[in-house]
């Protein structure tokens, strides 16, 4: 029997971030995975980031997590999505070389102090007096710890479907995790089934690249990580093609052979990453669906056809793929498949990602009903931090939907639950003007420094950057001009006699620090590394001031906790229906109570009144 502070089960994106975060806080951590050489494997698409997802990667990085640095080390086609739109909704993304990503992640994991990696199959969880305290391995080994983090991905009772063929697996060639699913049911947790899918892998040497379009990388790649100075990998194009009427006919004629449409699959798939069968059934009026042909590596001929995930039989896959321009002679290296797996209802979780019914147990990733590497990594970081905090007797750290996309995601999951795999979008955040990808470090790194999860190198670099930023902002706010003075330098200002600072003027369309230098030569002293941040903050300053009151109100409601044992039955004036709904949902604070269907402002006032009464009674007893 071996003792640790924290045990992390699963070596995928959530598990790596959880183990790293726990170890960075100083907890003796062990990462248990089926195979060490699969740590960092990208099971589905070879890409990191995107709309909403890129924000999560930046936030992971701001807390000194791994994904951003690893993506920078492996990225082979960087693109900033929504570049023409406002900074709040821009999404950094890169295609990644699978081999480079895996190698970079394994290097990171192997270099972390306080972290051990063990191969094996965690079969059961150990408990004492209702508290999780370790894991039992299939081979008989026992590991004990103050906290356990489960990051099982699609391995929890995983089942692959290719046509009518079923293969128990967590992914191709790897056995599922069966014992832990039974353990969670034994604990009384509410489990469900979800489904995801992946397309066939193609031999790039058999693609007619002259018949497909091309999409290139950005000329100046923007890294994910604050710690990355430059992208060094060669950047490549990907191909672009479309399905045809012939493609659609083959799929429609064989839809009964799809595992998803034959009744073979119980689980619900991701709405925003539909299979090609779903696209044909739901959007049959379209004459074609776009496909991105994404090379899987700089020295790898494998191509990932993004947009045609499927669970049709192999012969049907071969037939419909060959109707796509450029793929007429293509060779399939691995068929596409759907995979079904167990997940836990995320409403079973605290905001710390700890399980309410089983203290000491934390869950992260697809086990919580999410989809995507980025969502998994962000949850892993939160679960790992809070598991480590528990192990050293510190209070958990909660992320707010007012300070991060991480907070938005966790609040959505724990308060609303899921009916399909959850994916992050910028539209999920009410305060997205504040929660931009470009300001993730300013928002979260100070909290990470306080927590102790940010290393010295990042802290020093961040503090130097912040000093430059604050010096530059002070300078911009100290320089001012009248409308008539500005007019002499070509500035179009309202002729109202009011002085405006350089910072104010930057909020005007088409203004920049460079354009203001003829008027104020001292602006040349502002370091290039903070110019864009200052320009964006100036552009959003008025809107941020308006949001500040709303954000303060939400934070106040989030900080008003509702005890787990709060008795809604004693509240006079609350309908029986609302009493039942609130007792079922068990909102953790007033902000979550407001989201319960049917809850009115009057009901919130009533709850708040009773909470205050309980506080006064407790104070009288204590006094």
Swiss-Prot record:
Which biological processes are named by the entry's GO terms?
A: tRNA methylation; tRNA wobble uridine modification
Positions annotated to bind NAD(+): 269-283
* Predominant location category: cytoplasm
Task: Kindly state which keywords UniProt assigns to this record, in alphabetical order.
Answer: Cytoplasm, FAD, Flavoprotein, NAD, tRNA processing
Kindly state the subunit structure of this protein.
Homodimer. Heterotetramer of two MnmE and two MnmG subunits.
Its annotated function is as follows: NAD-binding protein involved in the addition of a carboxymethylaminomethyl (cmnm) group at the wobble position (U34) of certain tRNAs, forming tRNA-cmnm(5)s(2)U34.
Q: Under which name does UniProt file this protein?
A: tRNA uridine 5-carboxymethylaminomethyl modification enzyme MnmG
Gene that encodes it: mnmG
